[in-house]
Amino acid sequence: MTTTSRQTPLHPVYVIGGGPGGLAVAASLRERGVRAVVLEKSDAVGASWRTHYDRLRLHTTRRLSGLPGLRIPRSFGRWVARADVVRYLEKYAEKHKLEIVTGVEVFRIDRAGAEWVLHATGGRRLTGSAVVVATGYNHTPRLPEWPGLDAYKGGLSHAREYRNPKPYAGKDVLVVGAGNTGAEIAADLAEGGAGRVRLAVRTVPHIVRRTTLGWPAQRSGILVRRLPTAVVDRLGEVIRRCFLPDLSAHGLPRPEKGLATRQREGAVPVQDVGLIEAVRAGKVEVVAAVEAFEDGEVLLADGTRIAPDAVIAATGYRRALEPLLGHLDGVLDGNGRPVVHGARCPREAPGLYFQGFTNPISGMLRELAIDAEKIARRIARGISRGR
């Protein structure tokens, strides 16, 4: 692509975050002749993928998880392993010759007329023609403010620190939280030699098979993503009854709300990668939600007291965007989430984009790839028009 002086802004587009979302936007911008600089606070791309637990694989298929301009190698298999995702991201950055600056953290973003000023590590003040925030859906570990937690002397860690079951061999472990991470860690512990595994559940999740009769759950998510919520709820219930065992006797009754309703509230379905069989076999015991920590014990919602050797809190993450953007009007909602995403900008902040802050049932990487192209197209069009 050839560019004219009008198409070349004085300042680059800054992309904050060197994960898949940020890399995809940078590559899509470069493809359109727009200079993009990726700012990554760690020392390498794909930082979060490097620290995920060992057994993690994509819950989406290889064919539907590639980023713009580079397919995931067929040799990685249908369900790509964590380490292979890292290798793919490294290759992606190399192939597209992306301009990446590591070891730089952005602390604050300010509007400066038609441009943006980023305040970063080492007193840097960087001026960009546009900014894409791609710091990640799972940014900062969230730990509930349980009563008595400060005085608890037992072993407590967030799921972000979990790597494999080896340190928990023979131990009594309580996993708190029944999302995808908590469910998989519980299954991993049960299969990996933990003495006892309990899973504390507050809201019963929707569980789906990764594949049903060879058909990936992701493809179903793509097909139904534009259907009315009530319709998807009914379809989800039919599939649950036909293809999933009744786990009510094991502490996992039918969820109170439908699958799509819960997804709209931010709770994606749990893909089964071992939890169902572990629960049915009694290797994972479902218990009530954690209410407090008291006298060295964990107090559950049903009044039960337990004293596990270790507690792993799979209690989610915060976006942690408030320090970066909380001072700007009309950018974040009351929960600290971006008011828009993809190719849309907040009304009061033209030139500010958000990438990767949704978790759709059609697959996060797939949607990152789609949104990256849309964002790049929008930015390039604005530059060509002299905006």
Each predicted region: which residue ranges?
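Flavin (primarily FAD) cofactor-binding/catalytic cores of flavoenzymes
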Residues: T2-S42, G46-S48, G77-A217, G221-R387
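A short acidic, helix-capping loop that chelates divalent metal ions and anchors anionic groups
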Residues: R71-G77
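Redox-cofactor-proximal catalytic regions of oxidoreductases
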Residues: A44-R71, E99
